[in-house]
UniProtKB/Swiss-Prot annotation:
The record marks 111 as: Important for acyl-CoA specificity. The record marks 192 as: Important for substrate specificity. It catalyses: L-homoserine + acetyl-CoA = O-acetyl-L-homoserine + CoA. This is Homoserine O-acetyltransferase. The keyword Lipid metabolism does not apply. The active site is at residues 142, 235, 237. It is found in: Cytoplasm. It comes from Succinatimonas hippei (strain DSM 22608 / JCM 16073 / KCTC 15190 / YIT 12066). It is an enzyme of class 2 (transferase). Keywords: Acyltransferase, Amino-acid biosynthesis, Cytoplasm, Methionine biosynthesis, Transferase. Its main location: cytoplasm. The lineage of its organism: Bacteria, Pseudomonadati, Pseudomonadota, Gammaproteobacteria, Aeromonadales. Its EC number is 2.3.1.31. Pathway: Amino-acid biosynthesis; L-methionine biosynthesis via de novo pathway; O-acetyl-L-homoserine from L-homoserine: step 1/1. Transfers an acetyl group from acetyl-CoA to L-homoserine, forming acetyl-L-homoserine.
Length: 301
């Protein structure tokens, strides 16, 4: 089934070129089934690229999905054209009185900044707190996970000595939780973060069920018992070359980054990496939409 996104959004032409079923708003209005409505809080600097990555994953299910794009504030972006933000993104005040079937809160390049020093922290805290009453299930990603854990469990930011960057093997929990239904016992996923999410700390201080982790990455996937919050510390939405792009960006900035682990063929950055996490990424987002959103959300709010 298709994903329904706003007319004119750049992601529409990109996805259509990849033969991904994208439905126009006009056509969607003639569908008799009730579509899911998701709120997408995009905290990443390169918003268009992030939109495309997530929408690829959200489109690969039998469910029709409508997307509302949300920005946390109106600051002038250095990486996204202002007309794009003004055209496609809503402010929180516009949607505060609505309810949503699902919500995604992306990561942000704020790993080494205290929450109190994040300029939009108060607004973000308000949005995340609001989501508990107005969203059936919210999926947090990377830095968004740290923000959610701070707000819901008062967990402080834990930083690693070195950035975790690369593609790592994870172990799936022996659980009947439908979020990992169909997962292999082990699977690969990319990470790109300074934040640490030790599994033992998460188990000790929260009620989360850890559904996948590894000794290297710590917790990768966890959920609350009521399925209302999902936490994904990696970046299953990433394209094959995203880690490469980040590595070259940091090189150009003089940061002397480490080579992403288990990523470039023969650890040679001149070679093109493969995407070896695509199938499990699609399964994760499909399971979330089906079992945590569609099967739980009320037909009428």
């Amino acid at each position: 089934m298709p994903i329904n996104i706003p007319n004119g959004l750049p992601a529409a032409s990109v996805l259509a070129g990849e033969q991904i079923f994208v439905m126009t708003e006009e056509r969607a209005t003639h569908q008799d089934i009730r579509p899911l409505t998701l709120l997408f809080l995009n905290l990443m600097p390169k918003k268009i690229a992030t939109e495309i990555q997530y929408m690829r994953k959200l489109s690969n299910t039998p469910l029709q999905v409508n997307i509302d794009l949300l920005r946390v504030d109106k600051h002038i972006s250095k990486n996204t054209p202002q007309p794009h933000l003004d055209t496609f993104y809503k402010d929180f005040e516009e949607i505060e009185g609505r309810n949503y079937d699902g919500m995604i809160i992306t990561g942000a390049p704020l790993d080494q900044i205290d929450f109190s020093d994040v300029t939009y922290w108060d607004k973000l805290e308000k949005i995340i707190t609001w989501s508990k009453e107005h969203v059936t299930s919210t999926l947090f990603s990377c830095w968004g996970v740290a923000a959610g854990l701070k707000i819901f469990y008062d967990l402080p930011l834990i930083n690693r000595k070195e950035k975790l960057s690369g593609v790592f093997l994870h172990h799936t929990a022996q659980s009947l939780n439908p979020l990992i239904r169909g997962f292999d016992d082990t699977f690969l996923a990319p990470h790109s973060r300074f934040i640490d999410f030790p599994s033992d700390v998460i188990r000790k201080h929260t009620d989360l069920e850890i559904l996948a982790d590894s000794e290297i990455t710590g917790m990768f996937l966890a959920a609350t018992p009521d399925r209302r919050q999902v936490f994904v510390t990696g970046h299953p939405e990433y394209d094959a070359t995203t880690l490469s792009d980040e590595y070259r960006r940091d090189l150009a900035a003089g940061k002397d980054p480490k080579l992403p682990e288990n990523y470039f063929p023969h650890d040679d950055p001149t070679q093109i990496p493969s995407c070896v996490w695509r199938s499990h990424a699609s399964l994760l987002f499909g399971n979330w939409l089906n079992y945590y959103v569609y099967q739980i959300t009320p037909y009428k709010w």
